[in-house]
Design a protein with these regions (language model features):
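Generic secondary-structure boundary/loop-capping signal
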Residues: 14-15, 40-45, 121-123, 129-133, ...
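Substrate-binding/active-site clefts of carbohydrate-active enzymes
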Residues: 1-62, 67, 92-95, 112-113, ...
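Active-site-adjacent bridging/hinge elements
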Residues: 33-34, 59, 163-170
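The substrate-binding groove and active-site-proximal loops of carbohydrate-active enzymes
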Residues: 39-54, 71-80, 132-142, 171-175
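Short loop/turn motifs at secondary-structure junctions
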Residues: 68-69, 168
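Active-site-proximal helices and loops of the catalytic beta/alpha 8
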Residues: 2-9, 62, 66, 76-160, ...
Length: 175
């Protein structure tokens, strides 16, 4: 779709699939400006408010469920996805398969913004990454103890009581 926009510009039927303007340019000199993910123009940002984009994505998910029997998705950079989009995605996926799981990658902030009954089932627990690493590598249990108490402790104010976060020791983003 984006190559079609590069070729036909404003005459492309996909021009509304992306955040772009024909009044500017990028470092790639395509003859128009477009928004990239977190400033990376090689990763062109999709317009998730466009019904045609959502339909295209949902059709792809439907085909993966039918052809391969997938029962979940890991959403890279889920923190960039609007909650309204996540709600639509969850409703669609569970309509295909009631036990379909959405796992979102989140870095910082309140994970409840991306996780809940209508959003992702779970998200990555970057807050505990360093504490887990320290507990295994330097026997420092304070960091992980503090983070886990803050997230799941017995107090009423804990952040994620009853939630299931994906904690990890290593991944491709922390090497």
């Amino acid at each position: 779709a984006f190559q079609e926009v590069q070729k036909k510009k404003w005459d492309s039927p996909y021009r509304d699939w992306f955040h772009l303007s024909f009044d500017g340019d990028t470092e790639y000199h395509d003859g128009f400006w477009y928004e990239g993910w977190e400033g990376h123009n090689e990763l062109v940002k999709l317009n998730l408010w466009n019904p045609a984009v959502i339909e295209h994505q949902f059709n792809a998910i439907r085909s993966w469920v039918e052809r391969f029997g997938i029962d979940g998705l890991r959403l890279d950079v889920a923190y960039c996805l609007p909650p309204e989009y996540l709600k639509r995605l969850r409703a669609f996926a569970q309509g295909l398969k009631p036990d379909f799981v959405l796992m979102g990658e989140t870095l910082h902030g309140d994970y409840n913004r991306w996780m809940g009954p209508e959003l992702c089932h779970s998200v990555t627990n970057y807050e505990c990454y360093k504490g887990l690493w320290s507990s295994f590598n330097s026997r420092n249990m304070f960091e992980i103890g503090h983070s886990l108490a803050r997230q799941f402790g017995p107090e009423q104010w804990t952040l994620y009581k009853g939630a299931h976060l994906l904690s990890f020791l290593d991944n491709h983003d922390v090497d």
